[in-house]
Structures are given as structure tokens and as C-alpha cells.
Amino acid sequence: MDDTPDAPELSLFLASTAHDMKNSISVLSGTLERLLARATPQTESAYPEMAHMLYQTKRLNDNLMQLLALYKQVGTPAYPFDVQPLELGQLVDQVVALERMLLQSRGVKLELDYDPDLVWHFDEDLIVGVLSHAINNAIHYTCDTVRLAIRTTDDGWLELRVEDNGPGYPPALLRAGAIATKETAGGMNFLTNSAGLGLYFSSEVARMHRHRERRGGLRLENGGRYGGGCFILSLP
């Protein structure tokens, strides 16, 4: 008798396990944020290590969130794709709240450049997740400043940029970004490309946003205001 679970049961089990892991990581992340909020580098000798632990837990939480979304297939009844009008001020407030303690603990300044009253249509939860993931990465690579800039382009796109003043993306990561924006999940090698999952997820979220013949897109480049890495999400 073959006791091997079939594919649907295995997928459900893996998704449930990932969800439990994400909940545990969220508890750990929240605990670290509270500890860091009560400490300073002067009063707590382990402050730098705690800040690094917070970065790593947020990175792991991002990966689990992305895996869950892919398992549940965003756009199906199990994980609906919900596009609604939202003021950019509300979007940015959510992102800043999620990143505040990590930025503070790592000594990184967040610069904001956007019109808080501008309204755009997008899936709020997914875009918050993509921007938070991009800022987490920028915090790791920057010298001391991360910039979140959101603007409309002359040809009618909403451009969301996360920039830093670090050394810029290495060639391998720029190539990974180019691959992630072109390939399907089956073509991405997540095992050999550590950045692949986050980039693929972000590009899929971008492509899900459509208006008439336009689809959202993602690109990575070096330059921007500070000459470092630039994560650029474009929504129609």
C-alpha cells in the first residue's frame, strides 16, 4: 500500500507549515523590535547583533510571505487579487511603520518623496509587501540613506523607486533582476539564485497590475539620486 501523499495534500501541508513558520518569525521579529525600542547602542552591548537579527528575521519573513503567495496562487479565490483606489499617503504610512525600527536600529535614514494625496489603483497588501522587501534589501546594502520616491510619469505610469547610497547592485544581481522579469516560476532557479524568489515575486506582482494593454513591470539599475542601487516598480 502506497502511503505517499498526493500533490494537493502535500502542497496544502507545505503551505500550512510555511504559514506556521511565518507566524513564529513574526512573533520573534516583534519581540526584537520591542527590545530594540527600549535599548540604545550605548546601553546595550548586543545592540548591533540584535539589529542584525531583526534584519534577518524580516528577510526570512519576506521569503515565507512570498512562498505562501506563490503556493496559494495569487488571483484565485484562495488568495484574491484585490485592486482598490488608495492614497499614496496611506501606502507610505504602512511601509514606514513596518520599517521604522529596522531603519533606526541600523542607523539608516529614510527619505520620502511623494504626493500623499495622489490616488492610484493597486493591491494594497501586495504592493506594501514588495516595497517593504525592497527597503529591507536597501538597508542591507546602503551606507546610511534609503530613499522611497513615488511619482507619475509623463506617459501615465506610477513609478515607485527604492534607492540607496551604497555601492550599487553587483552585476550578478542585475542579471538576476533581468531574468526574474522575463522568466516564469518554472524557469527560475531559486536554489542557485538567492535573490531569485524576491525578484520573481515582485515582478509577478507588477505584471498582475494591468490597465488596458499595459502591464506593470520591475527593473533594477544603478544610479538614481545617490548613485547606488535602484529598485523600480512601475504600475499602469
Sequence positions of predicted segments:
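Short beta-strand/loop element within the Bergerat-fold HATPase_c
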Residues: 145-156
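Glycine-rich ATP-binding loops of the HATPase_c
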Residues: 207-223
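Conserved catalytic submotifs in the C-terminal HATPase_c
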Residues: 84, 109-118
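Conserved micro-motifs of the catalytic ATP-binding
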Residues: 75-81, 119-122
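Acidic ATP/Mg2+-coordinating residue in the GHKL
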Residues: 164
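Short helix N-cap motif at coil->helix boundaries in the Bergerat
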Residues: 168-176
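Short alpha-helical segment of the dimerization/phosphotransfer core of two-component systems
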Residues: 55-63
